[in-house]
Amino acid sequence: GCRLVDAGTRGEESVDYPDFGVLAAEGVSSGRFERGILVCGSGVGMAIVANKFPGVRAALCLDEETARLSRQHNDSNVLVLAGRKTDPDTAGRIVRAWLETPFEGGRHQKRLDKIRELEQRLCK
């Protein structure tokens, strides 16, 4: 199993998603969390917030295939879901696919290394 830290909202009222996205993304960036899962209406805002943090590779996934590919090819460490577009059953399948899929490495590692180099250069 895995340890779960719920850093989400506690109600139905509208909130500022960056305030919540930063909690998970900062945890992944610092190494405190191995992975994170974020949800907002479209998923776009949370993905933008999370990808501001060094070492975070957030992927907005709307289906199981993109969830698997984001892990296999990109070693994504933050999954972002679109709450308005994803029903609970589909969300469960996406999360399961994402959690169970390993990074393939190989040619994909070379590409990740290039992304890390770019990130180091730009985040000084």
PLM features: what roles do these ranges have?
Residues 15-18, 48-49, 91:
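Short, well-ordered secondary-structure micro-motifs
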Residues 2-14:
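A short beta-strand-loop structural module common to alpha/beta enzyme folds
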Residues 64-124:
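C-terminal binding/interaction regions
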Residues 38-39, 44-84:
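Mid-chain, well-packed structural core segment of small domains
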Residues 19-42:
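Short, structured active-site "lid" loops
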